[in-house]
Structure formats: C-alpha cells, structure tokens
Amino acid sequence: MKIRKFFTLVSLSALVLTGCNKENQSQFEKLNIVTNDELKKERNKEKASLYLDSARQSLQDVSALWTNREPGNHVFSPASYLVAWSSLLAVSSQTDAYQEALCISDPKAERLGLLSSLNGIEKNNWDDDQILTSIKTAAFYQQIGNKYAFDKKKQEKLASEYVDSGVTDVDHYLSQAQEYFTEKIGLKRQIPEVFPDKDSVLVYGGLTRKDNADLGKRSGAFTPLNGVEKTVDAVPIGNRWGTESFEYYKGENYQRRSLPICSTSLEVILPDEGTDLKDIDIKKAYLDFKENACLTPLYGYVPFFKTEERIDLTTIADKVNSDCVVFCSELLKDDVKNDLGIRNVIQNSDFSFSDKGVEGESITIMEIGSARPQKHPYTEFNVNRPFYAISSYGSLPLFVNQIVDPVFN
C-alpha cells in the first residue's frame, strides 16, 4: 500500500496560538480563544493549559457547523494553526518568545516531536521475533500567505531542519511540486490547484523515508456498512495474547475506545444503537474520556482505508470568526513576524489511515475480540454504523472526523 499523507497548513481561527490585533479582540473573547495577553498570564505555570483548552473548545465551535451540512464524511482540524506555527519555527531561529509564552523548555524538540508524529514515524517491537518496523514518513505541503516570502537564510534554515525540502514559484508550482514529490520524495500524487496569490511562495518538505513498512501488516476480515465481508490489509492493535490494555469509556449514549497509531492515537466515538450521530456532544465526549477512561484488554486489527474530499477551511474559519485575520504580533521578533500572514488557504484533503498514521479524514471499520479467555473481560467493539474519530497527539486533538459511509481502501 502506498503512503498517501498530505498536509496543508491552514489558519483555522477556532484555534489561536498567538496574538491578534485589538479590533478583533472581542471576537476572540466570544469564542473563548486564547490570545496573547492570556498566554502571558499563564507563564511559568502548567504547560500551555489555556492553549489545550482552546483546542478542546474548538471541537465545539467548529463541529457546530456540521449541523448545517449534508450527511457525509467530513473532517476539520482544530490543530491546523499549531502546525502552521511549528513550520514557522522551522525557518526561524527566534524561538524564545514561543518558549516563554507556552512554558516549553525545549521548543525545538516539541516542534519536531509534533511534526514527527504528523509524518507517521513509528517503531514497533513484536514480541514474536523482535522485528523493528520503521514506518515510511510522508511529505507535507503548505501554502501560507497572501505573502510568504522568507529570505534566503530562512529558506536554507528550512532545508537544514528537514531531510529534504523545496520552494517553488507561484507560476510553476504544480509542475515543480510534482517533480519534487516524484523525484525527491518518491511519492506520486496529484498536486491540487490552490490559486495562490502572486506574491506567495509555496514550500514543500519531507522527513526521512524508510521502506520496510510492510513488516507490521496483517490481514483481517471486516464487514462494512453494506454487509459484504472483505479481507483487507490491517495494522494489529494489542497483541495476539491480548495482554495489552487501552483506554475505554462508556458514555451516556456512546462508547469510546483509544487506539494507538504511530505516535498519535485514534479515539473512536461510537454512538449506541439507535442514537443519531449528531446527538453526541463531541466536546463532552472528549473531556469525559480524558478524565474517566479505564484500561481494558484489547486485541484486533484496524483496516486500511482512504477517502478524498476537498474542503475550504478558510470559509469555515470565516463562519466561526467572520472577517478575522489571524497573524503573529508581539510573540514574534520584528525580523520574522511579517513572514507569517495566514490568509485564504484551501485544504485539499487526501486522507489515509494505515500503519503509517492518521491524517485528514478517517474512515474505520473495526472488529475486536479476544484470542483466548482472559482474566479481565474484553470489550467487543464493532464499528458498523456512523461514528466520530479523533486523531490526537497527547491531549491535543489534531483531526476530528465525522464518518457516515466507511469505505475500504
């Protein structure tokens, strides 16, 4: 199975890491979004607690838009702004403001840890034969701007931070990006039209690639919503003795299970039979799970799947916070703050979930049972109806997915 992970870095104003200009302050306050002044109050306290609260709040703010959408598979990313911010740090040596504001002792390690997670680096030790699996990583794509013009030194900084990177001009970005992905990264993908501003620069980057990703694959029989059983490649969860335990929580009208995927986890929220998907309060389910989940034994397989959907997250952000342009101000030094003006970015979500990780929109069908009787009872978890899935990095929700029609890859 070819890796198909695709990153578009967007400004989703439901999650704000930095300051905003005064005229937009009241709009941010209405949504309980973290602003520069609030972050200052949080210094030398618990690590970025307001920042995480803002991410959780965004689950409610943005998912409310789904009530007006046609039924179907949808995705949004409350963490998109964080990814954009992390990429800025890749081309700037000015990390002290970031460190001070979020109380992070090693911002470079924090950023690289996040980007490594998003790019699917994984190491699995199998007890059977001690196989070490290093999963192939993916490239990401971004357009930040209406102006994205890092100077030469900053472009060189980007190239040194990643194993490989490329910068294209606007007029030829499609052909240049295709050449970059094919020849340098080794991925064949269709580069989307993003209609960039003429003053923009498009940046592409990739991390280390490993080609022994097939070592962790297994096969399993799964039954999608159409009722036709299908045998597909899958990534194991737990182990064949069923001795590993993962977080599980039974809510008022749903159950929720956390599944480790690479450095991230996929947390599936499955409504009870007869419960409409929209009757689930995502934010409450998220917080209840974090506070009350219990470890239960688990063994099974998660199949590979993929969907494609084009989403304009700029439009979504405008609905949440109309006419608000998010930009860096006091937290950045003068020589870098003008490099980040995040506007009008289209996300083209070509999403896949596999042993490489989770990115974009998730569709999962899953059956889990025990290999033999255990001291602790198993929780059988069958995803045979519409559900939510949250891809998380620690306690930070990266992608929230509404799945109505699961489709195998």
How would you name each of these model-derived features?
Residues 7, 20-167:
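Detector for small/aliphatic-rich hydrophobic stretches
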Residues 12-19:
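Hydrophobic h-region of N-terminal signal peptides that target proteins for export
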Residues 71, 88, 111-272, 295-373:
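Non-catalytic, conformational "gating/processing" segments within enzyme and secreted inhibitor domains
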Residues 253-269, 374-409:
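Extended hydrophobic
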Residues 271-296:
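Internal alpha/beta scaffold segment
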